[in-house]
Amino acid sequence: MRAALLTLAFTALAAAADDATTTVGFFGGGEWENSNDDDSLPLIPSYTSIGASVVDVNAVETVLAISCLEGAATESCSINDPWTMTQGISSFSWYAEYTAFDWNPPVTATLDYNCAYENYTLSATCTYSMSYSGSSDGAETSTSFSTETSWDSVATYAALEVTGGLDKFNQPEATETPEGGAGFAGPIQAMVTAAPVLAAGLLASHASGAWRKGKILLIKPFKGILPRLARLEASVKSPNPYRNEPLTPNLDIRAPSSGQCNASLYTRHHPGCFDDDIDSLGQVVLSSQVLGVFFNRLCRVEFVCPDAQFACRECQPVFVDIHCNDVPSTKLPCCRGRKQTNRPCPKNKHILAWLELCKAEAMHRDSKGLKDNAFVKPYVVGELVAEVPRQAEKGRQRAMDNIARSRNCGKGHVRT
């Protein structure tokens, strides 16, 4: 069985023409894996010209009814019964039935998408199913597809035009928690109106004319522009999803037979922020060896775009976050762009200098525990117990000196 990567790119990009129209966001999920035995991916019958109306909103969930925009041609949008979409603080559901007349033969399709999650960016489990069938002039077609997956962190969300019921966001019920429900301060509108609007603008700036016209593409092969959009959306949604994630493989020092636990350095390359040379740092193994025992530590470099609406424009302020096990994160402010070339993003050699400090910090911390480690004691004699921490401290200081030299270019920014 070969796995095919998919992405859910739920998008309805439509400009707000007047005060009666706005754009809200909804849960888009992450990267999907096709569990079918073959590599073929079902095409999703297309539709355009849809809009939503707010049915109900409270502090726990927002319910939307989705139908065709007024005056939409039947060929682009044919919905008999409005779709129901429910965006909650811990769940999401969307059920849709429609007819796609631009297919030959025309088909009637059904989509069913349900998710449960810890919050909008963490611990999501989703099921998705789709089926369609149709016949005309002797031609017949039908298919069905379903999948289920889960993610530790969620990468995407999407935008949808809302043309009715906006006054419900301003009603007292919008901030009230239903009986038996667990709400939060303020209606879910805060989630569905702010960042997703930004994502819609980003998608419009990168995507084809069909996307800008509001065409919705549900499941497409994970290739081409879609993975770039997914990563860019992730930088808007959660600039640093690994902030609270454990950063060590936790190699058991009492079991050296487990061998060297190789820990990779992960880089997140956000379009519009960094040149491709950053990708050469994709795999770096950091390990320190003390008296034949491996002390492995995972260091991660995180490329963050906090102002993602300016991505791919003239000057993109970014941060490089360097994480190391039990070592505080280090932020390097820099700028990639034409306007402020005096504040460039760090080159590989400067990032590697920080990684050396990360490695030295881990080794120094490990070495200080040698005296009390029951496994190491039989192999440590006299001055070796003191010498290892001294050497580790020297390495730590040397790395810090290198960092000081590399950043000595004014305003604390890393020079190239």
Curated annotation (Swiss-Prot):
Native species of this protein?
Answer: Aspergillus versicolor
Please report the name of this protein according to its UniProt entry.
Answer: Notoamide biosynthesis cluster protein N'
Q: Does the keyword Secreted apply?
A: no
What is the recorded function of this protein according to its Swiss-Prot or TrEMBL entry? Part of the gene cluster that mediates the biosynthesis of notoamide, a fungal indole alkaloid that belongs to a family of natural products containing a characteristic bicyclo[2.2.2]diazaoctane core. The first step of notoamide biosynthesis involves coupling of L-proline and L-tryptophan by the bimodular NRPS notE', to produce cyclo-L-tryptophan-L-proline called brevianamide F.
Q: Which residues form the signal peptide?
A: 1-16
Q: How is it used?
A: Notoamides have been shown to exhibit antitumoral activities. Notoamides A-C show moderate cytotoxicity against HeLa and L1210 cells with IC(50) values in the range of 22-52 mg/ml, but the IC(50) value of notoamide D is greater than 100 mg/ml. Moreover, notoamide C induces G2/M-cell cycle arrest at a concentration of 6.3 mg/ml.
Question: Keywords assigned by UniProt?
Answer: Glycoprotein, Signal
Q: Which residues are glycosylated?
A: 119, 262
Q: What lineage does the source organism belong to?
A: Eukaryota, Fungi, Dikarya, Ascomycota, Pezizomycotina
Instruction: State if Magnesium is listed as a keyword.
Output: no
